[in-house]
Amino acid sequence: IMRDPRFDNIPLILETVNPDIWAEEIAWLKSQAEI
């Protein structure tokens, strides 16, 4: 979904229930954006 152009300009919400892993999940999302 993150890379599908149909979702350009649509804000996405990151839902992470455990705040202890927020940094890890944000880092993973950033790595996916660089692909």
Swiss-Prot record:
Cofactor comment: Binds 3 Zn(2+) ions.
Catalytic activity: Endonucleolytic cleavage to 5'-phosphooligonucleotide end-products
Gene: nfo
Protein name according to UniProt: Probable endonuclease 4
UniProt entry keywords in alphabetical sequence: DNA damage, DNA repair, Endonuclease, Hydrolase, Metal-binding, Nuclease, Zinc
Swiss-Prot/TrEMBL cofactor(s): Zn(2+)
Family: Belongs to the AP endonuclease 2 family.
Molecular function in Gene Ontology: deoxyribonuclease IV (phage-T4-induced) activity; metal ion binding
SUPFAM superfamilies xref list: Xylose isomerase-like
GO biological process terms on file: DNA repair
Highest classification ranks of the organism: Bacteria, Pseudomonadati, Pseudomonadota, Gammaproteobacteria, Enterobacterales
Positions with a binding annotation for Zn(2+): E15
Entry's EC annotation: 3.1.21.2
Naturally occurring in which organism (per UniProt): Yersinia enterocolitica
Function of the molecule: Endonuclease IV plays a role in DNA repair. It cleaves phosphodiester bonds at apurinic or apyrimidinic (AP) sites, generating a 3'-hydroxyl group and a 5'-terminal sugar phosphate.
